[in-house]
Amino acid sequence: MSDPLSQHVSACLADRYAIERELGRGGMATVYLATDLRHHRSVALKVLRPELAAVLGTQRFLREISVAAVLTHPHIVPLHDSGAAADVLFYVMPFIEGESLRQRLIRDGALPPAEATRIGREVAEA
């Protein structure tokens, strides 16, 4: 982990999570594969971009995460943990091995209609 954000996140959360590698990065957040040191399991650790965290604010972020924490549905990934450490706002979900829908579409192109319909229905149910 050579980039400054990864090093900062790793230092801020070192007592609870060991960051293994970056899984992805978008406009709002960076997602890392990490080891939950308390429960000895692989997790996906999502960290809000610092500039977004500054605008959103810790209290609002924690309120919104508390709402998300009570959602239960087979097609919604559950929340394991969340918090603020220094200026790092984060939440933790199970790490699910496999490819994303985006990766699948890049690899294979358009989905067969029946499969696209099934996926769309599952997303809508969530």
Show which residues each predicted segment covers.
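Conserved ATP-binding/catalytic core of the eukaryotic-like protein kinase fold
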Residues: 1-126
